[in-house]
Amino acid sequence: MIKSDVQLDAKGLACPMPIVKTKKAMGNLTEGQVLEIQATDKGSVADLAAWSKTVGHQYIGTNEENGVFYHYIRKCNPEVSEAVEKSFEQTISNEGAIKEEGIILDVREAAEYAFGHIPGAKSIPMGELSERMNELDKAQTIYVICRTGTRSDLAAQQLAKAGFTN
């Protein structure tokens, strides 16, 4: 068991709420303190790890017990966190993406994709993106989508850091 300074109950919440609550809770911690987030959303595994990395906090890891994910994040220097965070604005509607040339990249979990997706969209769940970027063509325009925009924003940031410019 990992020692934490503060516990956050995000059980029963779906994306983006575990991240929203985590961000708020992290604001109340001092540098070096560890937050334990308890969540039941399977997407939280990839979402919280990616968010932590994006904003400069240390994602320590996740344990699962009886369908509850216990995530552990250590707060790092807030000046670094603010400097790293960057949002990408929506550039096209889902309907527009279907008509355009390029790749529609769906970063939702496989189960979410199975229940409904844009025809022709490529599914690479957020948690697999770093290992599967080689499946994408840097020369093509990539439209990144998810359910709420949170994961697609994080994915767009990861792609930009990896040299994807379209």
Task: Annotate each PLM feature.
Residues 22-24, 127-135:
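Short internal alpha-helix immediately C-terminal to a glycine-rich phosphate-binding loop
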